[in-house]
């Protein structure tokens, strides 16, 4: 992997021993929205500090690039807790920013 490109709205996220790229593509955001509900409502909840762990996991899961087929979703959830939710916030912010503003 060549790393995240912030100009494309990408960020990095450490999952276990892997540094992975998070890319909030249209398809990924549609998939996440089908699970979490409307993205604008999700952004509102995030702004109010009411984003749930399940919502964070869903956003990240659908936006992970080149996710190994053998990776279980629970692995992502465990990584979020192991490193602390604060470590995932740059990637979450990148996803929400992309949903609101698009790529500049």
Residue ranges and their predicted role:
Residues 23-24:
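Short linear motifs in exposed loops
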Residues 57-65:
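Short, hydrophobic/amphipathic alpha-helical patches that form generic packing surfaces
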Residues 30-32:
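Short Gly/aromatic-enriched secondary-structure transition segments
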Residues 1-14, 19, 34-51, 65-104:
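Charged interaction scaffolds used for protein-protein
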Residues 52, 56:
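Hydrophobic (often cysteine-bearing) scaffold residues that line and stabilize catalytic clefts
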């Amino acid at each position: 992997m060549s790393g995240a490109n912030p100009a494309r709205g990408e960020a990095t996220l450490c999952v276990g021993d892997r540094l992975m790229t998070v890319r909030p593509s249209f398809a990924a955001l549609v998939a996440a929205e089908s699970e979490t509900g409307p993205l604008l409502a999700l952004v509102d909840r995030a702004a109010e500090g009411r984003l749930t762990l399940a919502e964070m996991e869903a956003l990240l899961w659908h936006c992970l690039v080149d996710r190994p087929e053998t990776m279980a979703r629970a692995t992502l959830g465990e990584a979020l807790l192991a490193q602390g939710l604060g470590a995932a916030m740059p990637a979450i912010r990148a996803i929400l920013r992309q949903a609101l503003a698009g790529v500049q």
